[in-house]
Amino acid sequence: MESPPLYEISSSSSSEKPRHHFQSLDLFPNLNQNSCINNTLIEPLPLIDRINLNSNLDLNPNPLYAEEGEQEEEEEEEEDREVDVDLHIGLPGFGKPSNDAKQLKKRNGKEIATYDAGKGIENELSGKAYWIPAPEQILIGFTHFSCHVCFKTFNRYNNLQMHMWGHGSQYRKGPESLKGTQPRAMLGIPCYCCVEGCRNHIDHPRSKPLKDFRTLQTHYKRKHGHKPFSCRLCGKLLAVKGDWRTHEKNCGKRWVCVCGSDFKHKRSLKDHVKAFGSGHGPYPTGLFEEQASNSSVSETLFF
């Protein structure tokens, strides 16, 4: 009896078992192996930032030099953190700004940023910026305004502004277009006095900056400068012309209270009356003398 063909056996077995239990026959094993190898070769390389640099590969040929460089960078970062900002700005006409214009200092725990020749003033006005001008700068003041294009100087800022208009239309777009030529921004910076021992000196334990450059000029003239004005009545020397006029006007006058106290200045008498209240007031004779002096002045004007 002849054996049945193989395909009949497979057909009968396929009817008994479901098809998904069959294992697919690999008719070309060598070809499949080659395709897997090709697929592995075609895969893209990993990104550089995902490479593990802590592996056993020695990527640094000179490790000692690298460690020294890292230590130096860390020391520089620590020094930058310790020192921050002081301010010492020069006048626009006193020399050209240099590349090393900014200098860092630290005094008595106060951080200051120093600037030379007024460089970088426009960008550093915000925050706690201030100025410590030299005596020559205080006495001379802003008498020369310099053009940053041709370095021509002018005695007035308005003349400098008109001169800048001649350099091009880019300087005619309002005050913002003239940045770098305006010394008015410097005038508003708080200032410290440069005289040691002064209460407004930066090293004084109770130091306090003056409001602006003009206030510093008046302070320096009154406290540390030459006093050319002399009172013709008492001979007192004064440094500021306005103070001299006020002093001479009130020199020799005494403002008397009814309680018997007398004062040099009228405002002192007013403060006295305001502090003690009832029972105090200006002495009537002083008022009569003031009225008599006013009437004599009016008579001299009309006759």
UniProtKB/Swiss-Prot annotation:
- The UniProt regions of compositional bias labelled Acidic residues, in chain numbering, are 67-82
Please give the InterPro entries that the UniProt record associates with this protein. Answer: C2CH-3rd_BIRD-IDD, WIP1/2/3/4/5/6, Znf_C2H2_sf, Znf_C2H2_type
The record places its C2H2-type zinc fingers at 145-167, 192-224, 229-251, 255-280
GO MF: DNA-binding transcription factor activity; zinc ion binding
Indicate the segments annotated as coiled coil, or none if absent. 66-84
Q: GO biological process: what's one of them?
A: flavonoid biosynthetic process
Bilayer-crossing residues are none
Chain positions of motif Nuclear localization signal: 221-224, 264-267
Q: Where in the cell is it found?
A: Nucleus
Predominant localisation class: nucleus
What happens upon changing L301F? Answer: In strain: cv. Landsberg erecta
**Which keywords are on file for this protein?**
Coiled coil, Metal-binding, Nucleus, Repeat, Transcription, Transcription regulation, Zinc, Zinc-finger
What does the UniProt entry report for the null mutant? Lack of flavanoid pigment accumulation in the seed coat endothelium (transparent testa phenotype).
Superkingdom of source: Eukaryota
Q: Which SUPFAM superfamilies match?
A: beta-beta-alpha zinc fingers (SSF57667)
Q: In which tissues is it expressed?
A: Restricted to the endothelium, the innermost cell layer of the seed coat and detected to a lesser extent in the other cell layers of the testa.
Q: Which GO terms describe its cellular component?
A: nucleus
Segment Disordered: which positions? 1-21, 61-82
**What family is this protein classified in?**
Belongs to the WIP C2H2-type zinc-finger protein family.
Q: What does this protein do?
A: May act as a transcriptional regulator involved in the differentiation of young endothelium. Altered differentiation results in incompetence for pigments synthesis and the lack of condensed tannins in the seed coat. Plays a role in the regulatory network controlling flavonoid accumulation in endothelium cells during seed development.
Q: How does it assemble?
A: Can form homodimers. Interacts with MYB75, TT2 and TT16.
Q: Kindly give the PANTHER family that the UniProt entry links to this protein.
A: PROTEIN TRANSPARENT TESTA 1 (PTHR45878:SF17), ZINC FINGER PROTEIN WIP2 (PTHR45878)
Q: What is this protein called?
A: Protein TRANSPARENT TESTA 1
> Which organism's genome codes for this protein?
Arabidopsis thaliana
Q: What is the lineage of its organism?
A: Eukaryota, Viridiplantae, Streptophyta, Embryophyta, Tracheophyta
